[in-house]
């Protein structure tokens, strides 16, 4: 089914490219200005910048698997991005779903660049509650993937038009 409000697929690909550029610039910045493991508080007790490398996936899943996971996550990112891109081009998504897809594609491909270039993903954002609770470090690509996923959920909860 073709969605009437989903025209202009190049803008969604441009948005995905912008996400990749922002992600890569931020990673280059932190990788060049921080020592590995260095922590700089931004909001004391809640938010830090740091520099860590993640050879696995979210929450360091499979970080110690021996290297094959890099290829698995790369193939998965290309497959998902290809499927999302195809659906954007074929106008099968609503406008909100296109936005979500662009965010997910940009984030996934931003992390693929890291995996292929460095063998790991560069993370630098650390959210925590003093010394009691720490969320795993993440990056802009991860943030865009999460926002995209939330937008997909929101889009799926909309009532269908008659």
Swiss-Prot record:
InterPro entries: Peptidase_A8
Catalytic reaction equation(s): Release of signal peptides from bacterial membrane prolipoproteins. Hydrolyzes -Xaa-Yaa-Zaa-|-(S,diacylglyceryl)Cys-, in which Xaa is hydrophobic (preferably Leu), and Yaa (Ala or Ser) and Zaa (Gly or Ala) have small, neutral side chains
PROSITE patterns: SPASE_II
Stated name of the protein: Lipoprotein signal peptidase
Signal peptide annotation: none
Active site: 123, 142
Function: This protein specifically catalyzes the removal of signal peptides from prolipoproteins.
UniProt-recorded Gene Ontology molecular function terms: aspartic-type endopeptidase activity
HAMAP family, A to Z: LspA (MF_00161)
Enzyme class: hydrolase
Pfam family of the protein (one): Peptidase_A8
